[in-house]
Amino acid sequence: MPHKQVVIIGGGFGGLTAAQSLRDADVVLIDRTNHHLFQPLLYQVATSALSPGDIAWPLRTIFRRYPHVRVVMDEVLSIDRTARVVQLRDSRPIPFDILIMAPGSRHSYFGRDAWEESAPGLKPSTVRPGWRRASRPTSSSSRRCWT
């Protein structure tokens, strides 16, 4: 009996765990980035205790010992559940027998969207710009603010 074709959308904890567990399937893991970010340690990058490379690992390196897993770096445009195909931005459509959705999470402000400005959270989209600004202060007063 041929192996099932499993497509996993998302290279976070859920996607990694599913891909590593499904040894009797042909797995295609799709993510927009080529790395897994260990988000519980983002605060240590934000405080300069760790560098970004210490908490981000290439997905292909993680799955080097898993020959049943193929990693595709692309953006999912649509999912045709009837035809069982995932449409991607830059790659050919990928057929599936089983689809696992593990795209990650977003912050919830429980209907109080104004809170986002004061409490942006420690996601890469909020940490990186602050780190870049801090690494290139333009004046001595802003330099003091970041140190």
What is each residue range found by the language model?
Residues M1-H3, V69-T147:
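FAD-binding core/adjacent interface of flavoenzyme oxidoreductases
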Residues M1-R70:
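Beta1-alpha1 glycine-rich phosphate/pyrophosphate-binding loop at the start
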